[in-house]
């Protein structure tokens, strides 16, 4: 009788490890698929080194990121003159920021989306980037697909 309980206990532990392994594998594949979308999105906004070198650095006001020097928004800048190449670079920089600072600046899908919403104002405001090549709805939809959903 005691042997049966030991065998059952071993089977239960083995099954628990298998289930944990399946969950971890599924979670890992979800994360990988979200991060692989960066390659697809890179074609949405052309990369330009011009904007990255010319822009000021500010610190975003996000939960866990207040006064955190590891979280710059390097795409803020004086007006681009609505230059298409500079505006595309601003969009690419947002995508780069999401991936470069995942877990440092935002660690939930919700605050990543909040970042995406705030960045449109920077992209579009005449006194900042001054770009209007992408409307706000398209901007949010594009960046929502970049935010890792974990």
Swiss-Prot record:
The lineage of its organism: Eukaryota, Sar, Alveolata, Ciliophora, Intramacronucleata. One of its GO terms (cellular component) is extracellular region. Residues 1-16 form the signal peptide. Coiled coil: none annotated. Keywords: Pheromone, Secreted, Signal. The keyword Metal-binding does not apply. It comes from Euplotoides octocarinatus. This is Mating pheromone 1. Its main location: secreted. Mating ciliate pheromones (or gamones) are diffusible extracellular communication signals that distinguish different intraspecific classes of cells commonly referred to as 'mating types'. They prepare the latter for conjugation by changing their cell surface properties. Transmembrane segments: none annotated. It is found in: Secreted. It comes from the Eukaryota. One of its GO terms (molecular function) is pheromone activity. InterPro entries: Mating_pheromone_EUPOC. Residues 17-52 form a propeptide.
């Amino acid at each position: 009788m005691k042997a049966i309980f030991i065998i059952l206990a071993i089977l239960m532990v083995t099954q628990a490890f298998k289930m944990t392994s399946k969950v971890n594998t599924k979670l890992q594949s979800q994360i990988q698929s979200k991060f692989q979308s960066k390659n697809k999105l890179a074609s949405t906004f052309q990369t330009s080194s011009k904007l990255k070198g010319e822009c000021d650095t500010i610190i975003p006001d996000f939960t866990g990121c207040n006064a955190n020097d590891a979280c710059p928004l390097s795409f803020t800048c004086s007006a681009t003159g609505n230059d298409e190449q500079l505006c595309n670079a601003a969009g690419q920089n947002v995508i780069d920021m999401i991936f470069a600072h995942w877990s440092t600046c935002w660690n939930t899908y919700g605050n990543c989306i909040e970042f995406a919403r705030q960045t449109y104002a920077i992209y579009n405001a005449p006194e900042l980037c001054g770009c209007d090549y992408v409307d706000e709805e398209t901007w949010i939809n594009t960046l929502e697909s970049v935010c890792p959903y974990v």
